[in-house]
Design a protein with these regions (language model features):
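Conserved alpha-helix/loop element of class I SAM-dependent methyltransferases that forms part
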Residues: 1-8
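Conserved class I S-adenosyl-L-methionine
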Residues: 9-18
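Class I SAM-dependent methyltransferase SAM/SAH-binding core
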Residues: 19-96
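A short SAM/SAH-binding and catalytic strip from SAM-dependent methyltransferases
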Residues: 107-122
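Conserved beta-strand signature within the Rossmann-like core of class I S-adenosyl-L-methionine
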Residues: 133-143
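Short, glycine-/aromatic-enriched active-site segment of Class I SAM-dependent methyltransferases
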Residues: 141-160
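Conserved Class I S-adenosyl-L-methionine
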Residues: 184-264
Length: 264
């Protein structure tokens, strides 16, 4: 939020809002939040979370919570969301956003945090830029997949695939005539397990995540290497009064935060 330069007075589109972690934080600051996602399950959880906090603004797409979300049937226009409230509705990157009340310059800031999952990246970035009056921002993967612990993968003898999402976004935004800026977020993640066996079988899935390059080493060899790695790096901890196991170092996931002023 701080990287996006949001102060709490803006109208913000949270595109690909998921369960609403960002949307709720923005509303708590006083922002007027339009939260859109293609997933009914995610929106149901956001709906409950926002309602519990008194942040929910009713009047999103007709039939909210059902399997049918017709466009253009709003009781509340997205541009009229009150401060500190969240208007959730179901909308995908591929939809015509104007049918949902999101025309040119509808919001101050348009954000897509770790959610630019689309077949046409350029079209999606154009849409995000078009609805913003001041600024558009995205957070995208840089380096290896967020699902993969690079240290574990290397220990298993697996070749890491680096993602170029940040380079693609930067290039497209530049080609669209904007001046993108980039900064980085390094997010530490830890996970605990109820037993060493659970840790082993959970981390063994690293091979599945890197399936395109996994044939360079046998399943048996990578599994043996993982066992050896865990013998050296799996440590016992106490969590909520119970014995658990975790790796001795957190996994750090790098993200690229890319923003650009649209100057409407």
């Amino acid at each position: 939020i701080s990287k996006a330069g949001i102060t709490g007075k803006e109208t913000v589109l949270d595109m690909g809002c998921g369960t609403g972690s960002l949307a709720v934080a923005l509303a708590a600051m006083g922002c007027s939040v339009i939260a859109a996602d293609f997933s009914k399950g995610m929106l149901d959880r956001l709906h409950s979370k926002a309602a519990e906090r008194g942040m929910l603004l009713e009047g999103g797409t007709s039939g909210f919570g059902s399997d049918i979300f017709p466009a253009g049937d709003f009781e509340t226009c997205p541009s009229e969301v009150q401060a500190g409230k969240i208007l959730p509705f179901r909308m995908s990157w591929e939809d015509d956003w104007a049918n949902y009340g999101l025309g040119k310059g509808s919001v101050d800031v348009a954000v897509a945090s770790r959610s630019v999952i689309t077949h046409d990246l350029e079209d999606s970035l154009k849409k995000l830029s078009a609805v913003a009056r001041e600024r558009a921002c995205v957070t995208v993967c840089t380096g290896v997949s967020p699902r993969v612990d690079a240290r574990v993968a290397r220990a298993m003898g697996l070749e890491l695939e680096r993602h170029n999402d940040a380079l693609f976004v930067f290039g497209i935004v530049s080609d669209l005539g904007y001046e993108p800026t980039v900064s980085y977020i390094h997010s530490p993640r830890t996970k605990s397990y109820i037993s060493p066996d659970e840790a082993y079988y959970s981390l063994l899935r690293t091979r599945d995540y890197l399936a395109d390059t996994a044939d360079q080493i046998s399943v048996e060899e990578s599994a043996c290497r993982l066992r050896s790695f865990l013998a050296d790096h799996l440590v016992e901890i106490e969590e909520d009064g119970a014995k658990r196991w975790t790796l001795d170092q957190p996994r750090v996931v790098p993200w690229a935060f890319i923003s650009w002023d649209v100057g409407i």
